[in-house]
Structures are given as C-alpha cells and as structure tokens.
Amino acid sequence: MSQPESTSQDQLPTWVESSLFKGMLRGIERETLRMQSNGFLSQGSHPKALGSALTHPHITTDYSEALMEFITPPKASIQETLDYLKDIHAVAHKHLENGEKLWPLSMPCMLDDSDESIRLAQYGTSNIGLFKTLYRRGLGVRYGRRMQTISGVHYNLSFPDQLFEALQHNEKDEALKALSAQDYRSHRYLGLIRNFIRLTPLVMFLVGASPSVCKCFMTGREHQLLPLLKGTLYLPFATALRMGRFGYQNSAQKELGIHYNNLPDYLNGLQKAVKTSYKSFSRLGLNDADGEPLQINDHVLQIENEYYSLVRPKQVPQEGETPSGALANRGIGYVELRAVDVNPYSPIGIDENTAGFLEVLALYCLFTESPELLEKEQDVIDKNQTEVVNRGRAPNATIVENGKSYFIEDWSRTYLDKMQAFAELLDHSYETQIYSKALQIMQARINEVDETLSAKMIEDTVEYGGTWSFGSYLAQKHAEAYEQHQLSKKASAYFKEVAQASLDKQEQLEQDTTQSFEEYLSQFR
C-alpha cells in the first residue's frame, strides 16, 4: 500500500485536527460457549432468566443453543464499551444453570463424537424464530456443526460525519468531490475495508489467540496438526487457526467474485448469491426423509448473513429491510471488523489494548490510499494470511507485498510506525493514552514474539496440561471476576426489565398465526 500524495510516509494531512474524531462510535459483539462442569459443551437451553434469544438486544445466541453472543450498544469511548460488556458478562454468569461456565477460548471446549450434541439455537415457534433455527440447520448440513462452535469477537466502528465532510472537502479528485455525502462516505468506508483486508495478517499476528485445538474438534477431519499434549493438537508457530482452513470457510463463496471495490457491485454480488442454486447444496435436498426442512434453500447463500468475510460494510436495518437493502438505501454506516480472536486472558474476551489497536488500524486504513482490490492481489493476501495463521511466529515467516518478500516482523514494524501519528491524534481527541499504549504493546509483541497471545497460550496450555485444563482454569478465574463485578442498581434493573420485555415480544410474535411457516418459507425458496 502506498501513502496518499498529500501525506509524507509518517505524517497526517495538515488539515487534520482532533475535533474531527469527536463522535466516533464503537460496539463489541463477543461469542462464548456455555460449558458444563465436566468440560463438555452444554446441552441445556438458553437460561430463561436472560430473556428471549430472539428479541433481546444484548444477550442472544449464535449458531448453537450453547453459543452465547453478547452485544454492546454503540458507545462514545473504548472504556464505556468495555464497561458495558463487563455488565453483560456479569448478568449472564449470574443466570447460568447447573454449574455451567463461559468457555474462554476461541476454539471450542470438549465436543463428543456426535454432531447432534451441538444443539441448534432455538428461538420459539414464530415464523422468524423457526426460520432462524432452520438457517442454522442448513449451515450444519452444508459445513458441519463443529465449525459453528468457534467463537470470535466482532468490533464495530463508525466515524463521524464531520470527518467525511473534511475528507471530501480536501479531495483533489473532482469526481469524488461531486459525490453525495452518502456515496462519498460509502466510498471511504470501502477503501478502509480493502486496506483492512490487506493488513489482516497484522491482526492475526498481533492478536491471534488460537494456535491449538482440542483433539475432539478435529474428529473425522484430515489435518496436518501435531500433538502438543494428550488431547491437544497444534502447529508450533501458529497464531490463529480459527482464521485458517480449520475455521469457518465456504468454498462455494470463493466462486462468487464478491468484491469491495464499489457498493453497487458488492450488493449485486450478494443478491446473485442468495438467488443462485449451487449443485452441492441441491444434492443435500431441501427436506429430510420426514419432510422436515433441511435448509432454507439450495442457493449459494441461504440468506445474506451466510456470506463470510473478515470485515463487513454495515448499516442499521429498519423494520423489514435486509442488510443489503439497508446499505442500498442509506449507504455504509459503519464497519464490522471480524478477524479478531477471543483473548482468553480477558474475562470479557477483549482488552483495551486490542480495542485501541483496532481503532488506530481502522483510522490508518481510512486515510491511506486504497486502490481496487483485484483477484491477483487477493490471491497474494490469501497466501499471506495462510502463512501467518499457520506459522506467523516462525523465524523465517514472510509476507509478500507489491512483489517483494518481507520478514513478518519487519513488515509489521513498518506499519506500526506509520500508525503512530494516528494513535497520537486519537489520544489527543479523547484525552487518553490508550491508543499510544496499545501500539507500544503491539510493538513489544513484534520485538519479542514470545509476548504474542498465541505464544503465551502454547506455553500455558503445556503448563496446565492441555486445552481443557487451561480453558477450565481460566473459566473459573473469569467466573470469579464476574462475581466480583459490581453492577449498579440502574444496570441491574435495566437488564431485568429488558429480559422480561424480550420474552413478552417473543410471545407477541408467536401469537401471529396469519401465515403458516410453509408459506413464510416459500418466499425464500
């Protein structure tokens, strides 16, 4: 990536001032499995005291009934967001049943040999509830249920209107100056997304935290992983196996050619995918032997959400809008950064160092020139990601960029140096040192790879005697942190009220019987 003409290598444009960043918003989504006291995946239902997983705004489920998802609202600072996430964890932990705990690793706790023991998330008997469960059943028959037990952290980030206005005002390209505010904002967010994809190996190297897996996760799969200890497989220099071929992937999607070079093409690609049949999925059948639906349809994507990517353009949908409909109508409103492993050492799965680093990186990606991302370059990026996932901490691990090969430490250091000015700018905007401190922590990980999360995890997994023992130790430690967390009376009352309101909302949805589920489903087939 080259720098914009208006900046020197390590310098921001002269017109940039800290007030432009007032109004940035961020939100976090954190996934975590409920684990039984024996270390196996929970077979219990989502605790009713936490409300309805269908309609609760902050505590829901992802693929499995046991895979919880905690969602903060957009907040004005990193600290406020992390504090809110702590509240959610404390509430969820309080209502876990039968001695269950929250599993602290991205890669799952113990699974038995049967996929059927990975229960699909249940959302009640309304059409939308049944539809959500069927979507998950379809994912299971397409890709297997094991893959869907992996947890991650999604970091949502938006920049304020005045920043885009200033960027557009200072554009040299008259065509870009002439765009509507909405179209220009989408144009800049897409530039951010392309650059973030280019720099994803940096995220995997510095905050990757899935270098090993429980042996049970690989049941029935071919692999080249090595035994670390009894019951644990790993690669010696791996950083983020979750992001590699053992993690979530969809080979059918690779054929789509969906890209982030402009919004209309991205949306057209998505629309085509949700309407085009795919032979492998057609062969699975739409219904099982008993006539029960197996998948929503046989299309490349059952619904838009099935499209998996490391970063997503997002817009808050209004009632009745699809994600792509919201983007088409109002442009990109924020980005969702999805290449982030759960930090097992944090009770809430992420700390302020990772949050600060991601925000500086995103701002750097927004300001830096971002040419179109074409297939040839994407192939190189894919190879870079594979290198970092499998052997990012190896002494001779390399990154290829613009036809040249670099040692990963040198490559990473170059980009962190370029980001320094952006960290200082954000520190000034927020009257904090969070951002500069985050870069210092990441710099220390580059200088000494044994300081990376993935290296520490290997060391601790050996010390505690395996994935399960290490994860169980952390789960207990984090449970104590949740119990010690002081929830304010206001927050306590709010979560109680929201839980009940979500149950009432689900019941209301279930009373609407004007359309059978078969009729509802036919719209998508």
What label would you give each PLM region?
Residues 428-525:
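Extended, compositionally biased alpha-helical segments that mediate assembly or anchoring
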Residues 13-14, 129-142, 149, 158-327, ...:
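Loop-rich catalytic cores of soluble enzymes, especially ATP-dependent carboxylate-amine ligases
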Residues 2-140, 147-153, 184-194, 198-201:
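Terminal catalytic/cofactor-binding subdomain
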Residues 43-45, 82, 115-116, 167-168, ...:
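Short conserved micro-motifs at the rims of enzyme active sites and ligand-binding pockets
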Residues 24, 131, 147-151, 188, ...:
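Secondary-structure capping and boundary motifs in well-ordered enzyme cores
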Residues 108-109, 214-217, 378-388, 435-444:
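A glycine-rich phosphate-binding loop feature that marks nucleotide/adenosyl-phosphate handling sites
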Residues 328-329, 335-427:
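Substrate-recognition/cap regions that form aromatic- and gly/pro-loop-enriched pockets
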